[in-house]
Amino acid sequence: MPAFLNPAEAEFWVGAGLLIFLGIVFFGAKAHKAIAAALDAKAASIQANLDEAARIRDEARRLLEGLQAERAEAERQAKEMLATAEVQVRQFEAEAKAKLEEAIERRRRMAEQKIATAEAQAAAEVKAAAAELAAQMAESVLAQRLTGAKADPLVDRAIGQLASKLQ
């Protein structure tokens, strides 16, 4: 058996090492290219993911800014609406107060008119009662004076007219 095929000989191991080395170089070069290509593909995938993440982050930032702007606008509008409502409440209060004062004044005037009317009516009734009483007293005084004497028809007629005029 030749020496390079005998595993007990050093030449065998040198040949085996050379074949392994050449196999590694030959297949390693291809493997290196494949590994490099796989690493490049993985790097490209990672870069694409990073780019996508950056794009999503920018989009999220823009959305956040938009939402913050909308929120600020909504808060401004809410404050404006609240201020407007407060002004309207004050106006309604003032109007209600004015209407209440007007109603109170109108009722006061109506009460004064009723009181004045009642006073005038009472005064008229008192005057009528006083006139009737005066007429009755005058009639009784005249009747007492003329008792026994002949009654004058003119006096009787004047007394009758006096009673009708006083009423």
UniProtKB/Swiss-Prot annotation:
Broad class of the protein's primary localization: membrane
Keywords of this entry: ATP synthesis, Cell inner membrane, Cell membrane, CF(0), Hydrogen ion transport, Ion transport, Membrane, Transmembrane, Transmembrane helix, Transport
Keyword Signal among record annotations: no
GO molecular function: proton-transporting ATP synthase activity, rotational mechanism
Membrane topology qualifier: Single-pass membrane protein
UniProt-annotated location(s): Cell inner membrane
Keyword Ion transport carried by entry: yes
Residues passing through the membrane, by range: 8-28
Record text on subunit structure and interactions: F-type ATPases have 2 components, F(1) - the catalytic core - and F(0) - the membrane proton channel. F(1) has five subunits: alpha(3), beta(3), gamma(1), delta(1), epsilon(1). F(0) has three main subunits: a(1), b(2) and c(10-14). The alpha and beta chains form an alternating ring which encloses part of the gamma chain. F(1) is attached to F(0) by a central stalk formed by the gamma and epsilon chains, while a peripheral stalk is formed by the delta and b chains.
Entry's family note: Belongs to the ATPase B chain family.
Classification via NCBIfam families: PRK14475.1
Role: F(1)F(0) ATP synthase produces ATP from ADP in the presence of a proton or sodium gradient. F-type ATPases consist of two structural domains, F(1) containing the extramembraneous catalytic core and F(0) containing the membrane proton channel, linked together by a central stalk and a peripheral stalk. During catalysis, ATP synthesis in the catalytic domain of F(1) is coupled via a rotary mechanism of the central stalk subunits to proton translocation. Component of the F(0) channel, it forms part of the peripheral stalk, linking F(1) to F(0).
Protein's UniProt name: ATP synthase subunit b
